[in-house]
C-alpha cells in the first residue's frame, strides 16, 4: 500500500551486525521468471493461452561453449500454455521465451524494479543465477503487488523531537514501472501459481478468497529455498538456506512457502484486487 517495512528478520542473535534479510546475497532461482513473462505480455504477442515449447534448448555462450538448462524434474512437457509454464515453473519453456527478448531487456527490468546487485551477462540469470538479498527481491515483487508502481521500502515516516515537534518527514517516492494492463495480466498469472502451481499448498491454511499471488524459487542442488508473494496489503519474502551454502534438501515449496504462509496468517490480510483496465479482454479458449 505504501512501501512501509513492517519487519526484517534475518539474524540468529541480537546486535550481530549482519542481517540476512538485508545483507545476505544468494542465488534466487525461479523468483525472476515473472519478469520474463512480463516481457512477453508487454510485447503484445503473447497471452496466458499462447502455446510455447517446453523442450530441450541449447544456448551458445562464450566461444564454443553453450548452456543447456534442464527442468527440475529432468523431463520435458512438450507444447504447453504459457500460464501452465509459469504456474509449474518449467525451465525450458521459460528460457526459450526469455531468449526471444534477450539479456539486456531482462537486466534492464531488474534495474528498473530496484535491483542494485551486479547482474551477470549470462543467460543463466533467466533461471535466477544472480545473487540478491531478500530486500531486493521484496523490491521486485512490490512492483507486481501495486499494479506496476515502485515504492522503495520505507522504515521511517517522520522524525520528531522530545516535545513531539516535527523535524523531518519522509514522503513516498513513487514511480510507475509497469503498464497497468500488463501488471493486471501478470498478476493473474501469479495468482494461478497459488491456485494450481507451486504455491497451491498455501491455501491449506489461508482462504482462497484472498486471491494471493506469488512465486517459489529453488536453486541448484536445493541450496536455497525461496518464496515471494503478496496479498492485497502485504508483500513478504522468505529465504531459507545455510551460511556455508551446503545443501538443505528444501525446495521453495517445501521450505520457504510454509514459513511465508505462517507469517501471512499472523497479519490482517486483504484480497488482491487489481483493477482490470479497459484494454484487457477475456476470451474463451478451446483447449483442444
Q: Can you say where each PLM-predicted feature lies in the sequence?
A:
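Second-shell loop/turn segments in exported
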Residues: 18-26, 68-73, 81, 92-98, ...
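Cysteine/selenocysteine-centered motifs that mediate thiol-based redox chemistry or coordinate metal-sulfur cofactors
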Residues: 35-42, 47-54, 278-286
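A penicillin-recognizing enzyme superfamily signal
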Residues: 1, 5-8, 13-20, 32, ...
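Mid-domain, small-residue-enriched loop/turn segments at the edges of structured enzyme/sensor domains
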Residues: 64-71, 102-141, 148, 152-155
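Periplasmic/cell-envelope proteins involved in peptidoglycan metabolism and beta-lactam response
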Residues: 1-32, 43-50, 104-110, 122, ...
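Extracytoplasmic/periplasmic beta-strand context in beta-sandwich domains
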Residues: 50, 55, 123-125, 154-157, ...
Amino acid at each position: 500500500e505504501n512501501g512501509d517495512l513492517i519487519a526484517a528478520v534475518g539474524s540468529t542473535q541480537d546486535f550481530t551486525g549482519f542481517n540476512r534479510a538485508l545483507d545476505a546475497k544468494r542465488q534466487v532461482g525461479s523468483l525472476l521468471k515473472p519478469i520474463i513473462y512480463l516481457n512477453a505480455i508487454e510485447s503484445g504477442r503473447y497471452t496466458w493461452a499462447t502455446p510455447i515449447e517446453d523442450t530441450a534448448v541449447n544456448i551458445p555462450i562464450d566461444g564454443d561453449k553453450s548452456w543447456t538448462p534442464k527442468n527440475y524434474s529432468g523431463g520435458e512437457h512438450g507444447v504447453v500454455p504459457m500460464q501452465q509454464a509459469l504456474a509449474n515453473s518449467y525451465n525450458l519453456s521459460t528460457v526459450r521465451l526469455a531468449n526471444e527478448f534477450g539479456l539486456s531487456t531482462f537486466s534492464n527490468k531488474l534495474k528498473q524494479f530496484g535491483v542494485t546487485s551486479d547482474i551477470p551477462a549470462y543467460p543463466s540469470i533467466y533461471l535466477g543465477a544472480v545473487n540478491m538479498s531478500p530486500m531486493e527481491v521484496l523490491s521486485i515483487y512490490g512492483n507486481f503487488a501495486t499494479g506496476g508502481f515502485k515504492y522503495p521500502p520505507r522504515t521511517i515516516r517522520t522524525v520528531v523531537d522530545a516535545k513531539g515537534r516535527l523535524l523531518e518527514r519522509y514522503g513516498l517516492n513513487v514511480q510507475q514501472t509497469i503498464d497497468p494492463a500488463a501488471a493486471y495480466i501478470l498478476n493473474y498469472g501469479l495468482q494461478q501459481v497459488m491456485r494450481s502451481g507451486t504455491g497451491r499448498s498455501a491455501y491449506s491454511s489461508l482462504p482462497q478468497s484472498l486471491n494471493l499471488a506469488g512465486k517459489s524459487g529453488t536453486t541448484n542442488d536445493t541450496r536455497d529455498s525461496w518464496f515471494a508473494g503478496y496479498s492485497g496489503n502485504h508483500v513478504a519474502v522468505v529465504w531459507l538456506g545455510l551460511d556455508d551454502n551446503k545443501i538443505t534438501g528444501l525446495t521453495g515449496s517445501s521450505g520457504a512457502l510454509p514459513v511465508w504462509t505462517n507469517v501471512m496468517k499472523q497479519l490482517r490480510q486483504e484480497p488482491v484486487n487489481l483493477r482490470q483496465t479497459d484494454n484487457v479482454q477475456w476470451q474463451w479458449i478451446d483447449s483442444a
